[in-house]
């Protein structure tokens, strides 16, 4: 039997549902709405295996903040009402046949990346349900990303249209241009257009730095901020070596009776 693993970026989904509620203290409405959303995802994707991955609730920003101290330093804490309602949300999803994986100090995206990469590398189908374009660096013939809210696939044609690059160049792109919302600086003075120009000419940051053909207008910036770009790329990248502590059989989807 062919495997189709669906991984739900849980807080990505829950926060969007919660922010759309007229009364954001009404957690039962969030439970009900996310339940309907999960049922639609199940119908659309028809998984053989499924899991929802949750970030830990702590303000600990994980290993990325050790590399870049300003990383997500202004991240707003989860609203108190929503935090208190997380157990109810997880319980409602469990009743729909979906188990939860809670990170313990690791960011959810690294857990998602590790599991997705592990299964996709065995030529099994994986779908990540998330609006987070960061997952697009994982794209492969057997790994895809579904933006449920925009009803679109974040696939290679999307990346080509959005960034003009290949998925495997995205971390280098963010290493150069930065991600302002996460306080990933990149190289000061190099924005999206310059990053695209550089990565169209060279496959990686290292290749650009080592080449005599790097345009002069960028050479001084590279000389000054090359190490910063490498660190920013590391933080923008995804780890795929997290210890998961379970196997695929543990998350086989069984439709509740």
UniProtKB/Swiss-Prot annotation:
Amino-acid positions noted as binding K(+) in the UniProt annotation, renumbered to this chain: 176-177, 187, 190
Enzyme Commission number(s): 3.1.-.-
Keyword Membrane: no
GO biological process: DNA replication, Okazaki fragment processing
Positions of Mg(2+) binding: 109
One GO molecular-function entry: DNA binding
Keywords, in A-Z order: DNA-binding, Endonuclease, Hydrolase, Magnesium, Metal-binding, Nuclease, Potassium
Cofactor: Mg(2+); K(+)
SUPFAM superfamilies recorded: 5' to 3' exonuclease, C-terminal subdomain, PIN domain-like
Gene3D superfamilies recorded: 5' to 3' exonuclease, C-terminal subdomain, 5'-nuclease
Domain of life: Bacteria
Cofactor note (record): Binds 2 Mg(2+) per subunit. Only one magnesium ion has a direct interaction with the protein, the other interactions are indirect.
Record region (Interaction with DNA): 189-194
5'-3' exonuclease domain boundaries: 165-255
Record's function text: Has flap endonuclease activity. During DNA replication, flap endonucleases cleave the 5'-overhanging flap structure that is generated by displacement synthesis when DNA polymerase encounters the 5'-end of a downstream Okazaki fragment.
Family the UniProt entry places it in: Belongs to the Xni family.
Annotated protein name in UniProt: Flap endonuclease Xni
Organism: Aliivibrio salmonicida (strain LFI1238) (Vibrio salmonicida (strain LFI1238))
Gene: xni
């Amino acid at each position: 039997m062919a495997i189709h693993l669906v991984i739900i970026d849980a807080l990505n989904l829950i926060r969007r549902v919660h922010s759309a509620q007229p009364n954001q203290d009404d957690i039962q409405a969030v439970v009900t709405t996310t339940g309907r959303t999960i049922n639609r995802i199940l119908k659309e994707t028809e998984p053989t295996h499924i899991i929802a991955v949750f970030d830990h609730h702590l303000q600990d920003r994980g290993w990325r903040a050790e590399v870049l101290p300003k990383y997500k330093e202004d991240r707003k804490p989860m609203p108190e009402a929503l935090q208190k309602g997380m157990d109810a949300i997880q319980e409602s999803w469990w009743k729909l046949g979906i188990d939860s994986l809670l990170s313990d100090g690791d960011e959810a995206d690294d857990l998602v990346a590790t599991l997705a990469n592990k299964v996709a590398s065995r030529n099994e189908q994986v779908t990540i349900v998330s609006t987070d374009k960061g997952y697009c660096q994982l794209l492969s013939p057997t790994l895809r990303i579904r933006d449920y809210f925009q009803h679109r696939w974040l696939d290679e044609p999307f990346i080509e249209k959005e960034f003009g690059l290949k998925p495997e160049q995205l971390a280098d792109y963010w290493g150069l241009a930065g991600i302002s919302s996460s306080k990933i600086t990149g190289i000061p003075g190099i924005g999206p257009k310059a990053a695209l120009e550089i990565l169209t000419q060279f496959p990686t940051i290292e290749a650009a730095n080592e080449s005599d053909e790097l345009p002069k207008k960028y050479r001084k910036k590279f000389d000054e901020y090359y190490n910063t770009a490498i660190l920013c790329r590391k933080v923008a990248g995804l780890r795929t070596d997290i210890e998961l502590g379970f196997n695929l059989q543990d998350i086989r989807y069984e439709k509740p009776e």
